[in-house]
């Protein structure tokens, strides 16, 4: 990789015989990051909307897709825990709430602890 400052003071880099202005590379990286963020937020919003509409199975599908692509998404784990809770699936709900809390969002785990949702009923 070779750097060159031209007379117009625009930095360019040479790679494999091609010359690209650095601004185009930065713009491309920014656009890719923006697309990823928009996709992430779209899946999250869709999951939230389905949960609010009491369509827990469909919301769960969207949140599963979100967490498959972005496994460290704290709010995704929290919301998926809520979906499992409303579907009366206590163990997966507790697992997701714990994971969300490990990632910094402890609303679900606080609820589960206060309401004793995640304790064995024995």
Task: Tell me what each language-model feature is.
Residues 65-68, 102:
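Conserved structural position within tetratricopeptide repeats
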Residues 79, 113-114:
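Canonical tetratricopeptide repeat
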